[in-house]
């Protein structure tokens, strides 16, 4: 089973059917003394500290892997609201912590563009999250040119 990850509170093109629990993964890593000395020299002259970049990437992947194991144990299809946090634990050691909400999710059904009669669907045939709202008579028009001669307030002063 592949657990999908999303930093959003939802999973695009999926419907969340159940929120299971908060899941997390963490790892604590320390810097290698030799690499730390080299990084100190590199810090003086400038440039990327590749030893730290690699350490952070390895830490991030380890924390994600640990979180996924916990999500799989819950039977989750995805983890949403994914967040990372780092903190200094001791001199030269840091923790990388990742967490999110394990969820059950199913793919959304694609809405047909046209009904079988080859006519556009009416506004009452279903609701799409991307459907433009239809202005009612009670709502003022937001178009640039109004159909009447009433003065209009323009907050931009134009």
Curated annotation (Swiss-Prot):
This is UPF0145 protein Psyc_1853. Residues 113-122 have a biased composition (Polar residues). SUPFAM superfamilies: YbjQ-like. It comes from the Bacteria. Belongs to the UPF0145 family. Disulfide bonds: none annotated. Pfam families: YbjQ_1 (PF01906). InterPro entries: UPF0145_dom_sf, UPF0145_YbjQ-like. The lineage of its organism: Bacteria, Pseudomonadati, Pseudomonadota, Gammaproteobacteria, Moraxellales. Residues 113-158 are annotated as: Disordered.
């Amino acid at each position: 089973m592949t657990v999908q990850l999303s930093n959003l509170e939802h999973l695009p093109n999926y419907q969340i059917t159940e929120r299971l629990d908060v899941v997390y993964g963490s790892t604590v890593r320390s810097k290698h003394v030799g690499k730390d000395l080299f990084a100190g020299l590199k810090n003086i002259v400038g440039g990327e500290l590749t030893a730290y970049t690699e350490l952070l990437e390895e830490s991030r992947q380890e924390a994600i892997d640990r979180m996924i194991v916990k999500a799989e144990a819950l039977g989750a299809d995805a983890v949403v609201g994914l967040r990372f946090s780092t903190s200094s634990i001791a001199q030269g050691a840091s923790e990388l912590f990742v967490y999110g909400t394990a969820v059950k999710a199913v793919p959304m059904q694609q809405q047909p563009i046209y009904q079988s009669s080859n006519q556009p669907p009416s506004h009452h045939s279903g609701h799409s999250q991307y459907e433009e709202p239809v202005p009612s008579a009670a709502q003022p028009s937001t178009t640039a040119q109004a159909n009447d001669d009433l003065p209009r307030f323009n907050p931009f002063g134009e």
